[in-house]
C-alpha cells in the first residue's frame, strides 16, 4: 500500500523530508508518494503531513495566504498524522510568542523561537524518546524551546529539562530536525502504529 505523504514546501528545499518519509515507509514494507504542498487542494488527498523547518513567520504567512492552513487544520481534525519539525512546530503551536506568526493551534504548546541559539549554536544530541528503544541523534538548528505544554499533550523527549518532542493527538512536534539523520524512527513514531528500532 502506498502512503501519500504531503510535505509543506512553501519555503526552501524539502528533499530531505521526502527521503526520510520514504525510509520510514520502507521500514514498514510500504512505499511513499511524496507530494510537495505549495498550494491549496493537495492536503485533503494526503494520508500524512510533514510541516518542516524554515522561517516560521514566512511559512505562516504563506500557508494562510494560499489557503493551506485550513486544509492542515481539517487534516488534524480528521485524526490524520502530522509531523511538525522546528518551524513547523512553531506554526503548529497554540502560542508562538510572536504576533507575526498566525499559528494553526493544533499542538497545545507555547514555543519560543530560536531559543536554543542562532545558527552557529547548532548541535546534535542523543535523545531518549518515548517509544524508541535506543537514543535518537537529534539535530538542533536555531531550535525553538517548548516552554508550556497543555495537559493533554504527551512529552516524548526532553533536552536540558525542556520538552523538545511532543504528541498532541495525531500531531507530533519536534524542536529538532529528524530528517537530517539517516534514522527514520521519528517519522515512524509520527506516521505508523508501531516503531521499529
UniProtKB/Swiss-Prot annotation:
UniProt KW NAD keyword: no
InterPro entries documented for this protein: Class_I_gatase-like, PdxT/SNO, PdxT/SNO_CS
Record's keyword annotation contains Hydrolase: yes
Gene Ontology process terms (BP): glutamine catabolic process; pyridoxal phosphate biosynthetic process; pyridoxine metabolic process
Cysteine pairings via disulfide bonds: none
Catalytic activity: aldehydo-D-ribose 5-phosphate + D-glyceraldehyde 3-phosphate + L-glutamine = pyridoxal 5'-phosphate + L-glutamate + phosphate + 3 H2O + H(+); L-glutamine + H2O = L-glutamate + NH4(+)
Pathways involved: Cofactor biosynthesis; pyridoxal 5'-phosphate biosynthesis
Binding-site list for L-glutamine: 54-56, 113, 141-142
Active-site residues from the entry: 86 (nucleophile), 177 (charge relay system), 179 (charge relay system)
GO cellular component terms, semicolon-separated: cytosol; glutaminase complex
GO terms for MF: glutaminase activity; pyridoxal 5'-phosphate synthase (glutamine hydrolysing) activity
EC number: 4.3.3.6, 3.5.1.2
Keyword annotations from UniProtKB, A to Z: Glutamine amidotransferase, Hydrolase, Lyase, Pyridoxal phosphate
Similarity annotation: Belongs to the glutaminase PdxT/SNO family.
Quaternary state and interactors: In the presence of PdxS, forms a dodecamer of heterodimers. Only shows activity in the heterodimer.
HAMAP family in alphabetical order: PdxT
Function recorded in the entry: Catalyzes the hydrolysis of glutamine to glutamate and ammonia as part of the biosynthesis of pyridoxal 5'-phosphate. The resulting ammonia molecule is channeled to the active site of PdxS.
Protein name: Pyridoxal 5'-phosphate synthase subunit PdxT
Organism in which the protein naturally occurs: Haloarcula marismortui (strain ATCC 43049 / DSM 3752 / JCM 8966 / VKM B-1809) (Halobacterium marismortui)
